[in-house]
Amino acid sequence: MTGSSPSAGPLQMKDKFTDSGKLIFLCAYAIKKSFLQETIMANQSVTPADIFADLLRFRAPAAIAWVRGGDAAPNLSGLVKFYQTPYGGVLVEAEIFNLPNKQVPGSTDFYAMHIHQNGDCSDDFAKTGDHYNPSGKPHPDHAGDLLPLLGNEGYAWLSFYDKRFSTDDIIGRSVVIHSHADDFTSQPAGNSGTKIGCGVIEKADYLKV
């Protein structure tokens, strides 16, 4: 199948509609009811996947991170959302635009994504600190070691369930995207290369659902 990858990033939407970009861009999450909610009492075979799909389609995230590129990838932008689930863990959804392989037709490259200790994306992301690792475990068992992004001609979308942290644990920290894949072996950070994108994780309590 051929076709061009998505190119309009969420930061463009953020800048266009409001100063904060939050209310209008995310207003689709202010839906009170979903088909799943209306039928869940009658259907006892609802799976976690059904719940997760409902969260992504109809619910407001508990926290978000607007991701922007640094000197190495100035056009990179994206949005990472964190949903607290009824199972104790967090559903993570990431959508990233203009990854470095955007200019290579048909290219697919992996990019490491981690939660870092500090919520400071200044100075070309030099102040984000180490991976979020409250239990002091070796890499890749840090609570902040997330699944890698698969960039398809510069665009990546990813969603996964993670029970190593809650949304309250990570608010005020940062999501960092790296120039290379995480090898899940090298210490202390998986030999993931340069930091090319960063976003501070903030509470999304301005959304009323």
Region annotations inferred by a language model:
Residues 3-6:
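Short, positively charged low-complexity motifs
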Residues 28-30:
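Short hydrophobic alpha-helical segments enriched in small aliphatic residues
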Residues 10-11, 126:
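Hydrophobic alpha-helical membrane context
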Residues 11-12, 208:
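N-terminal low-complexity, intrinsically disordered patches enriched in charged
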Residues 33-209:
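N-terminal leader/targeting pre-sequences
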Residues 9, 16-17, 22-25:
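N-terminal amphipathic/hydrophobic targeting modules at extreme N-termini
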